[in-house]
């Protein structure tokens, strides 16, 4: 069940992980699932192309533990692929399917070949996932927490041991180094602010001013920002609501603050 998934793999199956997408491929396009020779993530493919692509061979594919931990068939706690999960995802024996080498943060994924303006001989790192890259750039250490509001909303923390959450609220990912990076990710991020800013017909600076001028608690209003459904919690058909509106509390300032 979900607890075993969380403890053994670090994540529970959700629509965003690679294993789930491979199961869709196996069910919707079985002929293509049967042809799969390798499975790689976008940044793995880009690194591979820089290193020569087909000329380098599929064996040249490489990744890092942070992105691998989001596939669903890489065990974050054990630090290795689980072929049984990949078999289940593609509904076939995948012993002939190549998976990228998982490199350390300071590992070398290859060197560039000359392509247009790109010179030959530049060492290539393994890259990392977006949130792992953010944690690396912020120089986060064990115990540090970050909040990112972009296309999605992300709360990330660096911890020293693997996280296991059977509810799926936290995804037990790995960091780009040797620590772990559990994530709580919402589908609705900056678009929540953008929609309210659009309704108030103000620019970002004025929107900030309005929110700061609002009263603590936004005059009793609560915005449930499920404009596109939601992934955490898993409510794909949910819609947004603005609750607690009163004649005195419903002001431009409090609307901005509620968002």
Residue ranges and their predicted role:
Residues 95-99:
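A short coil-to-beta-strand element that immediately follows conserved catalytic motifs
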Residues 85, 100-102:
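Short helix-boundary/re-entrant hairpin motifs in multi-pass inner-membrane proteins
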Residues 2-10, 16-60, 68, 72-88, ...:
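Active-site core segments that coordinate phosphate-bearing ligands/cofactors
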Residues 103-112, 189:
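Glycine-rich phosphate-binding loops at beta-strand->alpha-helix junctions
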